[in-house]
Amino acid sequence: MFSLLKPTVLWLAALGVATLAAVAPVEAGSRDKTFFRGVAGEWKGPGEIVAGKYKGTKFTCKLTGTAEETASGITLDGYCRVGMFKQPMKAVIKAAGRTYKGQFLDGAAGKGLDIVSGNVSGQKMVVSITRAKLNGAMIARLQGENTMTVTISVKVEDQMVPVIGMS
């Protein structure tokens, strides 16, 4: 079943576990570093594709987050599993002036996605994601020390449609 899922869908699922997202850009500072320190560590949990061709597909992911030492940002590395199939996942998000940039896997030029902008506001991060004609956003919210919820939406015509939810 997992092998039938398109890489883009799998990366959207991985984004769900990761954490990221888009508000008005602000210079990355100590409050952003506080958010990334909160995301650092082990994350594991279930998610579900809630729209589209693979609607109803459930998955679990396990990622290790490592906060950047010198600048704001994070690297998440691990895997997601659908049934007995396991797919490696990796995301790198770094401050780039007044925004955030990065990639999942090898970026949009390969089999992954590009993170083209992002912002942290309190316990929430929003990033814009892109791959070919796909545009979307991921919103991650820290809720206490051990809980994070993530929603990934893609742009369909003029609306953002949620496609993946995780908590």
Where do the PLM segments sit?
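Bacterial N-terminal signal peptides that target proteins for export
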Residues: M1-A13
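C-terminal segment of classical bacterial N-terminal signal peptides
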Residues: L15-P25
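Edge beta-strand at a domain terminus
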Residues: V26, A137-S167
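N-terminal helix-cap/turn-to-beta initiation motif at the start of protein domains
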Residues: A28-K44, E69, V92, R141-Q143
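Short beta-strand segments that buttress and anchor functional surface loops
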Residues: G47, T75-R81, G102-G107, K124-R131, ...
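N-terminal glycine/threonine-rich, aromatic-flanked beta-hairpin/loop signature
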Residues: K55-A95
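Amphipathic hydrophobic-ligand
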Residues: G56-K62, A132-L134, M160-S167
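Acidic, glycine-rich flexible loop segments
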Residues: G110-I139
